[in-house]
């Protein structure tokens, strides 16, 4: 299930993005400040390049690039 990013509370969205950009293995030694990484993800969500996917079985949300999301989730 896709969750529109603009329907989340600002604090909730920020925590979700911060969790994503600070997750082990996502920085690859990148020294970019947290605020910049959060801004980039927020922009990708706004442009429709990234989406928030909710898995009802695990009750977890994850950020994904739009082209990596199974097409059936867009129907």
Swiss-Prot record:
Gene3D superfamilies hit by this protein: YehU-like
InterPro entries the UniProt entry points to: UPF0270 (IPR010648), YehU-like_sf (IPR036685)
Superkingdom of the source species: Bacteria
Pfam families: UPF0270
Similarity field: Belongs to the UPF0270 family.
HAMAP family on file: UPF0270
Protein name: UPF0270 protein PFL_4336
